[in-house]
């Protein structure tokens, strides 16, 4: 299953 991309800190 593909998990939604988490907002990574830039």
Curated annotation (Swiss-Prot):
Q: Where in the cell is it found?
A: Secreted
Tissue expression notes: Expressed by the venom gland.
Keywords from UniProt, A to Z, are: Neurotoxin, Secreted, Toxin
| Any single Gene Ontology cellular-component annotation | extracellular region
Question: Does the entry feature the keyword Secreted, yes or no?
Answer: yes
Signal peptide extent:
none
Offer an example of a GO molecular function term for this protein. Answer: toxin activity
Q: Describe the family membership recorded for this protein in Swiss-Prot or TrEMBL.
A: Belongs to the scolopendra toxin 8 family.
Q: By what name is this protein known?
A: Scolopendra 8013.07 Da toxin
């Amino acid at each position: 299953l593909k998990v939604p991309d988490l907002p990574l800190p830039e």
